[in-house]
Amino acid sequence: MSKPPPKPAKPGQVKVFRALYTFEPRTPDELYFEEGDIIYISDMSDTNWWKGTCKGRTGLIPSNYVAEQAESIDNPLHEAAKRGNLSWLRECLDNQVGVNGLDKAGNTALYWACHGGHKDIVDVLFTQANLELNQQNKLGDTALHAAAWKGYADIVEMLLAKGARTDLKNNEKKLALDMATNAACASLLKKKQTAGTARTFK
């Protein structure tokens, strides 16, 4: 039996940096990047040379260069989702940045996409097999709470169609329905809850 291929780095353990200066490689296996480029570091096992990807090219980068000449981007997927930056979001996912990572407030990238009304971003996140729909942040809010509060009925509808839970309460004991700021969102959530209670035997 042949040996199984080595396991790839776990998604979410990829470190992301923005280069502050251009790096000119001295050997063919080193990675060229320019000031402002986003670098995805996938392997930091060698203390001197880290493996990274930039603009679809992979190569080695001196670790001390990254430490001194690049700034760390802690939650790149969240930043992309917040800004509605679709190409950066896709690049993060292509480079194995974890889709369910949490920022300091306990929010997922999906939460920020729903909060900002970025339907195209939500669409792309929905293509990720292990996406966590019902993650609650430190305030107990889910992506559904955010979409309802911001009044994005189209996104509320998308989340419900994917199976987002309507029975989760935040720290203030509020359901997404209680947070709905317009009739369209409230109506969708009410309809879903009524359908849900008819099926449960609590």
Curated annotation (Swiss-Prot):
InterPro entries: Ankyrin_rpt, Ankyrin_rpt-contain_sf, SH3-like_dom_sf, SH3_domain
CDD domains, alphabetized: SH3_OSTF1 (cd11772)
The SH3 domain, residue ranges: 12-71
GO CC terms of this entry: cytoplasm
Keywords, sorted A to Z: ANK repeat, Cytoplasm, Repeat, SH3 domain
PROSITE patterns noted in UniProt: ANK_REP_REGION, ANK_REPEAT, SH3
Keyword Nucleotide-binding applies: no
Main location: cytoplasm
Disulfide bonds: none
One Gene Ontology biological process: signal transduction
Taxonomy, superkingdom: Eukaryota
Keyword Magnesium assigned: no
Subcellular locations according to the entry: Cytoplasm
Name of the protein in question: Osteoclast-stimulating factor 1
Organism name: Gallus gallus (Chicken)
Primary gene name: OSTF1
